[in-house]
């Protein structure tokens, strides 16, 4: 019989997912709480040879974990926050967001160590449309190759010569103890990361106050506010985790700043619009920290919309619809 005072924590089966979950579990166990780790396979893991966009819809790395939560198989699920859709599953809560690791994209070069020193025609591998567009905007002379697989697989393929460099999230390399492979950090305003990149989230059932209370010590208030701003911006644009939108919120003292960009490819060229605002604006004075974060997200989204973001999104969705029909 299961110990009713223990917590069953669900995780994906990849090395990175298990490392992230083990970090969470170690902190829970330090509080004297027993933990059982339950591995759950997701659609994104099972179809690792297919580009994410071709699998279809947001949430390909989280749906099965959410189902395990809903059915009571697990009490909490550990996710990479950037994998979560902007529309939350009913009855589930993003209750706990630990302190964020580095949010930046990075380059791992085989010989050349930076984008600037890669020779013309070099091949760069990435699994992200956002990264691909930002890369092509900066170096249109490079060849972009879609890659899938876990971090270790990508590094082995790079070492075997499949590409001259790869782009991925720096946090994943750091968490796996592979930060030494990073040859260049790609930060804003050149490269805006995915919404929530570098952050973990512990998802629980909304009505499970007991588990939420036990795990509350892991919540990092500053990170939580930054994520609220980023996800509010994304939701206001009706974007999902597969849409080429980048955003990053940062704190300096009591001031929260949010920058975001949206990218579109049309007629072979990449268009990028970006906006940066902060809570020093008179429009958010006198509000609570949470209200400031969400209002800031809406304000940045509104500015992007003024610059043409909705038209760009509509154009992308129309193009995707045509591809689906032709496929």
Placement of each model-derived feature along the sequence:
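N-terminal winged-helix
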Residues: 15-27, 57-61, 86, 123, ...
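Short, structured active-site "lid" loops
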Residues: 50-76
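Small-molecule-sensing regulatory modules
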Residues: 2-47, 52-54, 137-327
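Short, well-ordered beta-strand segments
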Residues: 8-10, 77, 95, 125, ...
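Paired acidic/hydrophobic, glycine-rich loop segments that form the ligand-binding mouth/hinge
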Residues: 58, 75-80, 164-169
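Extracytoplasmic loops/domains of multi-pass membrane proteins
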Residues: 68-70, 79, 84-89, 297
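A conserved helix-loop-strand patch within extracytoplasmic ligand-binding domains
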Residues: 81-84, 88-142
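Ordered, amphipathic secondary-structure segments that act as subunit-interaction surfaces
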Residues: 72, 77-83, 197, 203-208
């Amino acid at each position: 019989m299961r110990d009713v005072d223990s917590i069953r924590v669900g995780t994906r089966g990849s090395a990175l997912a298990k490392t992230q979950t083990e970090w969470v579990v170690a902190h829970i166990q330090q509080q004297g709480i027993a933990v059982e780790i339950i591995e759950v396979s997701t659609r994104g893991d099972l179809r690792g040879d297919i580009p994410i966009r071709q699998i279809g819809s947001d949430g390909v790395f989280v749906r099965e974990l959410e189902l395990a939560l809903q059915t009571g198989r697990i009490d909490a699920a550990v996710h990479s926050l950037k994998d979560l859709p902007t529309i939350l599953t009913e009855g589930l809560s993003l209750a706990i967001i630990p302190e964020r690791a580095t949010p930046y994209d990075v380059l791992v070069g085989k010989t050349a160590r930076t984008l600037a020193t890669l020779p013309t025609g070099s091949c760069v591998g990435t699994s992200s449309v956002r990264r691909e567009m930002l890369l092509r905007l900066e170096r249109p002379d490079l060849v972009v190759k879609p890659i899938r697989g876990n971090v270790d697989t990508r590094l082995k393929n790079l070492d075997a010569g499949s590409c001259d460099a790869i782009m991925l999230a720096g946090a994943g390399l750091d968490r796996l103890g592979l930060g030494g492979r990073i040859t260049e950090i790609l930060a804003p305003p050149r490269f805006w990361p995915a919404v929530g990149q570098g952050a973990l989230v512990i998802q629980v059932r909304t009505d499970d106050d007991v588990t939420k209370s036990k795990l509350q010590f892991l919540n990092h208030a500053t990170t939580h506010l930054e994520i609220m701003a980023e996800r509010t911006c994304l939701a206001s644009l009706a974007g999902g985790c597969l849409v080429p939108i980048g955003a990053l919120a940062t704190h300096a003292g009591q001031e929260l700043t949010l920058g975001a960009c949206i990218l579109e490819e049309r007629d072979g060229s990449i268009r990028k619009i970006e906006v940066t605002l902060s809570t020093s604006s008179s429009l958010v004075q006198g509000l609570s920290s949470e209200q400031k974060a969400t209002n800031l997200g809406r304000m940045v989204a509104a500015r992007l919309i003024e610059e043409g973001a909705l038209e760009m999104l509509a154009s992308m969705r129309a193009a995707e619809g045509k591809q689906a029909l032709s496929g």
